[in-house]
């Protein structure tokens, strides 16, 4: 599915634009997606993921090897 983080699963949300006159029109809040390449030391190759900024922080915290193994366990990579 388009515009969805491969790690966290975050996708677009729906909300309202609110004008000064308090008129409301529908809008979409899109996730901050980035294409990033990550080096897997164990496999000696690059992995390209479409991730949000929150997922980048998660990868910094737990490591790319752990994140990729979790994705493979879910069957998403």
Curated annotation (Swiss-Prot):
Organism: Methylibium petroleiphilum (strain ATCC BAA-1232 / LMG 22953 / PM1)
Lineage: Bacteria, Pseudomonadati, Pseudomonadota, Betaproteobacteria, Burkholderiales
Family label: Belongs to the bacterial ribosomal protein bL28 family.
GO biological process, one term: translation
GO cellular component assignments: cytosolic large ribosomal subunit
Domain of life from the UniProt record: Bacteria
Disulfide bonds: none
Alphabetical keyword list: Ribonucleoprotein, Ribosomal protein
Keyword presence, ATP-binding: no
GO molecular function: structural constituent of ribosome
Keyword check for Transport: no
Protein name per UniProt: Large ribosomal subunit protein bL28
One Pfam assignment: Ribosomal_L28
InterPro entries given in the database record: Ribosomal_bL28, Ribosomal_bL28/bL31-like_sf, Ribosomal_bL28_bact-type, Ribosomal_bL28_sf
